[in-house]
Curated annotation (Swiss-Prot):
Residues annotated to bind L-isoleucyl-5'-AMP: E569
Cofactor note: Binds 1 zinc ion per subunit.
Gene: ileS
Role played: Catalyzes the attachment of isoleucine to tRNA(Ile). As IleRS can inadvertently accommodate and process structurally similar amino acids such as valine, to avoid such errors it has two additional distinct tRNA(Ile)-dependent editing activities. One activity is designated as 'pretransfer' editing and involves the hydrolysis of activated Val-AMP. The other activity is designated 'posttransfer' editing and involves deacylation of mischarged Val-tRNA(Ile).
This protein's UniProt keywords: Aminoacyl-tRNA synthetase, ATP-binding, Cytoplasm, Ligase, Metal-binding, Nucleotide-binding, Protein biosynthesis, Zinc
Entries under InterPro entries matching the protein: aa-tRNA-synth_I_CS, aa-tRNA-synth_Ia, Anticodon_Ile_BEm, Ile-tRNA-ligase, Ile-tRNA-ligase_type1, Ile-tRNA_ligase, M/V/L/I-tRNA-synth_anticd-bd, Rossmann-like_a/b/a_fold
Positions of short motif 'KMSKS' region: 610-614
Protein's name according to its UniProt entry: Isoleucine--tRNA ligase
Domain remark in the UniProt entry: IleRS has two distinct active sites: one for aminoacylation and one for editing. The misactivated valine is translocated from the active site to the editing site, which sterically excludes the correctly activated isoleucine. The single editing site contains two valyl binding pockets, one specific for each substrate (Val-AMP or Val-tRNA(Ile)).
Length: 919
């Protein structure tokens, strides 16, 4: 007789295969139609809130794997807090102004046509370009399963947004921190604009490393009794092109200096090194304290101009000569020491990085004709020739040098008139500097990982004033009126407010389109003819730094609370958005914009190498989604230690695919075996093994939640994977199969195991909903009603807590006994003594095993019987655990044709249990 129909075999419509690439878009469309973001808001009315403020990606080009990592991690954290019961707000945004977009438009229309276009037309083309890529990227982000307020994103080019950026600028001006001055700044000659620190990237470059002698003037030699003797300061530089603008030589204020027998002056601390390198050859003749040279004069060998000897703390003793070539127009330290000593600031380089008429006017070269209009980097070799015998040594070195982030060309330091936010002027209620306020705030923030605190602190401690002006067309103008006669900037509050109002109504294009009389506040009492517009635009980092005001503090978006609970970006944003947002908020209102900062690393290939098209190791999100589905990408993010660089490749994605299948199959097995369960029974009615797995699950899921609470998702998922593979699938689900399939539908053993499985299934859905949202939604769709609990979809699902269950079992003894038994079983199988463990029975005098009832004990070892009585038959194997005996025998009863256990009284007859079930 075939008893298969009488078995309660697993049954579920939940598919074994996810078919993620096909099913995810369908599911997301359903979510969109149901407006799940709005539903999430309604579901958490009156609940504690969590606000993650989105750092805006740039609206240019398709998203790359770094974007996917960032957005998925944000989505996981938002959903984690949501499923924990919090009300979340997530307004996505885009950075829409700036050089990259302007360059793309220029590439499209050509540089000549760009020059002919009215500024308003060019700006419209830039706006169109940004709008196009906002829509493209929005669609790409949705494909990652990200839930957000996609209907109401923030765009930095929206009129109201531009007005609020401008208002933030005005608030900073009101605090007295906005200053305009001529100062050396990072300058991209390829893009013809100033750059902020965050727009500078370091790449390797080959430069001439040169040592040059500056002979002391006769008057200065006379002061030291060196008349008619050679005495020259030796400077070291890797930028020969800056030598024409030299106006000083900086010495360390306390280090000793020496004059050598061959007539050169260097720091005593560096003398031996310089002699070893054959820069100088003479012995030490005289020692000097540095103050003895202060305000002495040396002669620039390139042009015969004077160079004042000054003292500066910036002079280092780890390299060079201890005598630093000082050109205040070409460096921050040079500029600062130049201010103290009133050194001339000479700037002979134009916006295109070429020598201009200044070299003629100031006689910076003996023959200016061959340098006029020449790119400074191309001038290096000519300058070295002109130095003649003053060039003591030249070595070409490969070193890290600042480059423009967009054009990837080496930049220069160039003194120009720019707008700055002062970092070290006192202001506000505390009468602190912006730097002091920022450093104080950083001490009170939470950082994930913790090392981010010191990194941000170090950058704030060392940063210069923030140069916020750019000489380009596509951006928010620094829209002030200047008095033509007095050069005074008009900071009248009513005038500024009126400009902001116009920007809100017409956009900041109005600054270019309208006449001054149309832009000027009617009641200002100012004559439009006396005024001119300032035409620089704002650094895009100021745009993104202002999002805290334009998004979180304005009433234009339902974006959550201010300050935000979290900012989350790549680790490069310690020098970017984390700083720009902090500095703008503190400068305008002395408040920190965020309570915590989480940073992630960069994406690299499986060898840890940077991705590039030339290497062919780029992993495109779109390709991954089409091949694997976004769930696998989301699992990769969650399983990676994002605090360092994240490796990704086809192999790594396949490994995550395997993990996904394990999770899916385990979940499917749980669903299939609780299909006919009507309600979860009380824990008190469960057996020891059911209580053991629930006790184990409770501990594991509590550990997972603790890890998730500090955003250590990989740690939590590794614990989950271990539990699913080892404890749940490897042991519990295996030992339950007999009772699930063969017991009566209402048998207490079966109901207890089903109930334990149902509780674990609910907790699994609750825990993984933030990561595998598509799959958990699908799982819920096929789950029994008592798990759904009235939920329409996963976004209605509430946090599940497993019951606290005391387990009396000694897990270590049970597991050790199971392991030892498995060794004997494997040997018997290998020797073909048995085909199945059900052919065996086990004797033991272990109280821990006998504490289980007979059914649970035999199920634990997957044998037909566990007895406290020794058998008379042959012992097939034995072992001891904790001093207790275990003996393995062949089962003496007959095989039951229904459950296959050797517990039947006669051949081909049913065992007692199966007989009762069939009746």
């Amino acid at each position: 007789m075939d008893y298969k129909e009488s078995l309660l075999l697993p049954k579920t419509d939940f598919p074994m295969r996810g078919n993620l690439p096909q099913n995810e878009p369908v599911k997301y469309k359903q979510w969109d139609e149901k407006k799940v973001y709005e539903k999430m808001k309604k579901n958490r009315v009156g609940c504690p809130s969590f606000t993650l403020h989105d750092g805006p990606p740039y609206a240019n080009g398709n998203i790359h794997i770094g974007h996917a990592l960032n957005k998925i991690l944000k989505d996981i954290i938002n959903k984690f807090h949501y499923f924990e019961g919090k009300s979340i707000r997530y307004v996505p945004g885009w950075d829409c102004h700036g050089l990259p977009i302007e360059q793309k438009v220029e590439e499209k229309i050509g540089s000549e046509k760009k020059k002919e276009l009215p500024k308003s037309k060019l700006r419209q083309l830039c706006r169109d370009h940004a709008t196009k890529f906002v829509e493209i990227q929005k669609d790409e982000f949705k494909k990652l399963g990200v839930i957000a307020d996609w209907e109401n994103p923030y765009l930095t080019m929206d009129f109201k947004f531009e007005a609020n950026i401008y208002r933030e600028l005005c608030a900073i001006a009101k605090q007295g921190l906005l200053i305009q001055r001529s100062k050396p700044v990072y300058w991209s000659w390829a893009a013809q604009t100033a750059l902020a620190e965050a727009e500078v990237e370091y790449e390797d470059k080959t430069s001439p490393s040169i040592y040059v002698a500056f002979e002391m003037s006769n008057e200065s030699k006379a002061i030291h009794g060196l008349e008619n003797k050679k005495a020259a300061f030796v400077i070291w530089t890797t930028t020969p092109w800056t030598l024409p603008a030299n106006t000083g030589i900086s010495l360390h204020p306390v280090e000793m200096y020496v004059l050598t027998s061959d007539g050169y002056i260097v720091a005593k601390a560096l003398y031996s090194k310089l002699k070893e390198e054959a820069v100088i050859n003479g012995e030490i003749v005289t020692e000097f304290e540095p103050f003895m040279f202060e305000s002495n004069i040396a002669i620039n060998p390139l042009n015969g101009r004077t160079s004042k000897i000054v003292l500066g703390d910036h002079v280092m003793m780890d390299s060079g000569t201890g005598a630093v070539h000082t050109a205040p127009g070409h460096g921050e330290d040079d500029y600062k020491v130049g201010l103290r000593y009133n050194l001339d600031v000479i700037m002979p380089v134009d916006a295109y990085g070429k020598y201009d008429e200044t070299i003629v006017r100031e006689k910076l070269f003996k023959d200016t004709n061959k340098y006029l209009g020449l790119n400074v980097f191309k001038a290096n070799e000519l300058i070295l020739e002109e130095l003649g015998s003053a060039l003591l040594k030249r070595v070409d070195i490969r070193h890290s040098y600042p480059h423009c982030w967009r054009t990837h060309t080496p930049i220069i330091f160039r003194a120009t008139k720019q707008w700055f936010i002062s970092i070290d002027d006192k202001y506000g209620n505390k009468n602190n500097t912006l730097r002091e306020n920022a450093l104080e705030v950083v001490e009170n923030l939470k950082f994930y990982p913790e090392w981010g605190r010191n990194r941000l602190k170090a950058m704030l401690e060392g940063r210069p004033d923030w140069c916020i002006s750019r000489q380009r067309d596509w951006g928010v103008p620094i829209a002030f009126f200047r008095n033509k006669k007095t050069d005074e900037i008009i900071f009248d509050e009513k005038v500024l407010n009126y400009t902001a109002m116009i920007f809100e109504q017409k956009g900041c294009d109005a600054w270019y389109d309208l006449e001054i009389k149309e832009l000027l506040y009617p009641g200002s009492g100012l004559n439009p003819d006396d005024l001119e517009k300032t035409l620089d635009i704002l650094d895009v980092w100021f745009d993104s730094g202002s999002t805290q005001n334009a998004v979180l503090r304005s009433r234009n978006y339902d974006a959550g609370t201010f300050p935000a609970d979290m900012y989350l970006e790549g680790s490069d944003q310690h020098r970017g958005w984390f700083q720009s947002s902090l500095l703008t908020t503190l400068a305008s209102s002395e408040i920190a914009p965020y309570k915590s900062i989480l940073t992630h690393g960069f994406t690299v290939d499986e060898k840890g190498e940077k991705m590039s098209k030339s290497k062919g190791n780029v992993v495109a999100p779109d390709k991954v989604i089409k091949e694997y589905g976004s769930e696998i990408l989301r699992l990769w993010v969650a399983m990676s230690d994002y605090q360092s660089d994240l490796k990704i490749s086809d192999n790594i994605l396949k490994q995550n695919g395997e993990l996904y299948r394990k999770i899916r199959n385990t979940a499917r097995f749980l669903l299939a075996n609780i299909d006919d369960l009507e309600e979860i029974i009380d824990v008190s009615k469960m057996g020891p093994l059911d209580k053991w797995i629930l006790n184990k699950a409770k501990k594991v899921f509590d550990e997972i939640e603790a890890a998730f609470n500090v955003y250590e998702f990989s740690k939590g998922l590794n614990k989950l994977n271990n539990f699913l593979v080892v404890d749940l699938s490897g042991i519990y689900l295996d030992v339950c199969k007999d009772r699930l399939y063969c017991d009566d539908k209402k048998d207490i053993h079966r109901l207890a195991s089903q109930s334990a499985m149902a509780l674990i299934a609910k907790k699994l859905i609750s825990t993984l909903a933030c990561i595998l949202t598509y799959t958990m939604d699908e799982l819920l769709e096929f789950a029994p009603a008592f798990i759904k609990d009235g939920c329409e979809d996963i976004f209605d699902f509430k946090k599940v807590e497993l019951p606290v269950v005391e387990s009396s079992l000694d897990e270590s003894i049970l597991l050790s006994a199971k392991e030892k038994f498995s060794e004997i079983k494997d040997a018997l199988s290998k020797e073909k003594v048995i085909k199945s463990t059900l052919e065996l029975m086990l004797y033991t005098n272990s109280e821990d095993i006998l504490a289980l009832d007979e059914v649970e004990a035999s199920d634990w070892f997957l044998v037909s019987q566990v007895s406290k009585d020794k058998q008379n038959s042959d012992i097939l194997g034995s072992f001891q655990i904790d001093g207790k005996d275990f003996e393995v025998y062949k089962a003496t009863a007959h095989k039951c044709p229904r459950c296959w256990k050797f517990t039947a009284n006669a051949e081909e007859s049913l065992c007692k249990r199966c007989e009762e079930v069939i009746k």
